[in-house]
């Protein structure tokens, strides 16, 4: 009797779990009724493209800073990972990164609208890597320099000069793959958020690496000062 009750309870739990997973998936993807969060987001992306991209980019940029600080164990002077850089990164994502991406990717899509040949797709990838990416990366590095405390043109220029080619090398590896995927599988109005997500992971990696190097250099300076 006890074994039978246990089996029935197990089946009931499995059924409830399956139903819950189904409902969560339906809410996320929209299911057949198109009422999920993804469907709602895509509708907002079509009806209010720039606003939706600004909110998406701002959220991802702020989250990127918090996540990179957590991975690198870079705590603020108050002992937590939410530093003054987080709201600055959020503002950068909303008012610089998103509008710039909206403009540049929009131009790229208009130039190649209706052109689906292999040659056109290759040209679009080349234009993205040789025109769009350099502009976005230069603006990104200038913004990061200012957020980090650069106040003179020389400081900003030095930051861009030092970081431009390393960032471009990462872009030249990831951008063709991301754009080829977008060309094949995604509607054009979802491209900018998709690239924002790709940029989120790349930016988190670069930001984490930079923080770790800075903390390591700081520890070396502190260790040297103690031995003197």
From Swiss-Prot:
Transmembrane segments: 89-109, 130-150, 162-182, 185-205
GO cellular component terms given for this protein: cell septum; cytoplasm; peroxisomal membrane; Woronin body
Family: Belongs to the peroxisomal membrane protein PXMP2/4 family.
Subunit structure: Self-assembles into detergent-resistant oligomers and forms a complex with hexA assemblies.
Domain of life of the source: Eukaryota
Keywords associated with the record: Membrane, Peroxisome, Transmembrane, Transmembrane helix
Function: Woronin sorting complex protein involved in both Woronin bodies (WB) formation and inherence. Localizes to large peroxisome membranes where it self-assembles into detergent-resistant oligomers that envelop hex-1 assemblies, producing asymmetrical nascent WBs. These structures are then delivered to the cell cortex, which permits partitioning of the nascent WB and WB inheritance.
Cellular compartments annotated: Peroxisome membrane; Cell septum
Signal peptide coordinates: none
Protein name, per record: Woronin body membrane protein wscA
InterPro entries on file: Mpv17_PMP22 (IPR007248)
Chief location category: membrane
Membrane topology qualifier: Multi-pass membrane protein
